[in-house]
């Protein structure tokens, strides 16, 4: 893909497709959840995009084994005080077995929406503020940089997993650096229990060999008062201000990784 800016909403439906930017081609759009759908996107003057519909690039379930490299995928909408429905997704995948290398995912709220299993992100840059890595899928995010922003006066939450009980192990962040800007309160994440989920949700996330800044509260909390507490988050062999952080036993860690060993662990050198 030639280095240029490609403005619009794009959808991938083809399996075993490879798209590689020459250096860093940009795909960008500026829709948000509560925005009326534009005419060019099939709008009727009433319907809104919704969270899923706000994505600049969407990968449909049929597009398995997708490979993307050397791209910037951006939602350029900027949140405005008082607006309802500020979720602005840059990228959503609904397909399994995707590999994403050297991709910049840029947005604010709900940047990266992972809603399928067995996706692998390597050497990526991801930025946002509220729940900006989220979804029900299983994914490894390896050797990447994640930036937590301050947009308006809201707290920042790095991730919001809503892992299905039948899924493998939710999100794994490995060999990754977290950086931050602003003075807002920042949390590792919050467990998401969406209304209308197709099955029981047990949010799961693991941070392995991750370097955290001092201003991040190393907890995953519930999203709403009264939400269940049946979520799990683990921090292993990680650092915050030079202090080693571990909250899981080695035996449990080995069990946690069992599913990924054949497909992924040789790639991420754990």
Q: What role is predicted for each listed range?
A:
Residues 2-267:
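Sequence-level preference for short, compositionally simple segments enriched
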């Amino acid at each position: 893909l030639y280095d240029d800016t490609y403005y619009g909403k794009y959808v991938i439906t083809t399996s075993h497709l490879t798209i590689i930017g020459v250096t860093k081609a940009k795909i960008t759009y500026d829709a948000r959840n509560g925005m009326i759908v534009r005419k060019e996107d099939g709008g009727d003057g009433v319907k809104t995009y919704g969270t899923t519909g706000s994505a600049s690039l969407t990968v449909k379930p049929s597009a398995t084994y997708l490979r993307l490299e050397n791209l910037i995928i951006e939602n350029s909408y900027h949140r405005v005080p008082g607006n309802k429905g500020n979720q602005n997704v840059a990228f959503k995948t609904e397909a399994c077995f995707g590999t994403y290398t050297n991709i910049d995912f840029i947005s604010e709220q709900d940047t990266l929406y992972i809603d399928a299993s067995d996706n692998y992100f390597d050497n990526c840059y991801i930025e946002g503020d509220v729940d900006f890595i989220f979804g029900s899928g299983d994914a490894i995010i390896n050797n990447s940089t994640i930036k937590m922003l301050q947009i308006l006066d809201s707290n920042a939450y790095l991730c919001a997993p809503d892992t299905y009980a039948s899924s493998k192990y939710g999100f794994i962040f490995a060999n990754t650096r977290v950086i931050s800007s602003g003075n807002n309160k920042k949390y590792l994440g919050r467990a998401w229990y969406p209304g209308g989920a197709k099955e029981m949700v047990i949010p799961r996330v693991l941070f392995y060999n991750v370097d955290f800044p001092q201003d991040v509260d190393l907890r995953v909390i519930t999203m709403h008062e009264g939400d269940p507490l049946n979520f799990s988050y683990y921090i292993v062999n990680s650092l915050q201000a030079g202090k080693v952080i571990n909250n899981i036993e080695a035996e449990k860690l080995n069990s946690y990784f069992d599913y990924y060993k054949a497909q992924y662990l040789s790639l991420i050198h754990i």
